[in-house]
Amino acid sequence: MQAFAFASAVSLALAAAPAESAPLRVASLNLCTDELALLLASPGQIASVSHLSHKPADAAWWRSARALPANDGSLLSVVPLRPDLVLTMGGGGGDKAGIARRLGLRVLDLPYPQHLDDIEQGLRAVSAALGRPQAGGALIARIAALRRGQPKRMVDTVWLGGGGRSVASTGLTADWMALAGLRQRPLRGDRIGLEELLTRPPSLLLRSDYRAGQFSTEQNWLRHPLARGARSRVLATDGRRWTCMGPSLIAEITRLRRLIS
């Protein structure tokens, strides 16, 4: 059922224009489709990426992205570039497809992934649309290898962001963590307080460094003496890669698995 829903969403998106040969000018409107395009497209195939990918604070791939023109995330912003394929995610459904038809654009609108299977299906869809199925297959094979080699011993872990924010114990983030041998602890409201951090410290704190240098109340929480005194092993992780939870996490999960084993 999940695979059918994913395929249906992709099919509706591609209905904006007839299928053609491999596109030569691809525009991506979304940070998460930027990631897929940069990983899967051939040199010179990308015409534009979203403005967020130009920002080092938001995108781990900003260096590659800055070699390309940025757009503001709207269909209208890429019309002057005359793309033959537009990539986006979770945006507008039928309305966006209708606008695309009026503008003469072919749009691939992916649903937001909920599980690892969705990541693999997204890779298949985008690599096929780009005319580069082998590139998608290579990344899918790497995810499959991680899944086959998932550690049997799981470490009690809390993924920790600013202000005590954490993540759900089920779903895509937890799925990726499990591939590294980390079991996300269930938390009320997906947050951990200083009291629990001190009285029931997890074996491991997976601390996101997303905007770690930014002055804010949430970041100050992580610097609180009580937070710093928690009796847990702490590993830092590149929080930017967890925003989309896409295939750029493959290398991060491999790194974490090596550190934990």
Task: Describe each region flagged by the PLM.
Residues 25-96, 185:
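A short, structured surface patch at a secondary-structure boundary
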Residues 92-102, 204-222:
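A ligand-binding cleft/hinge motif common to bilobed small-molecule-binding domains
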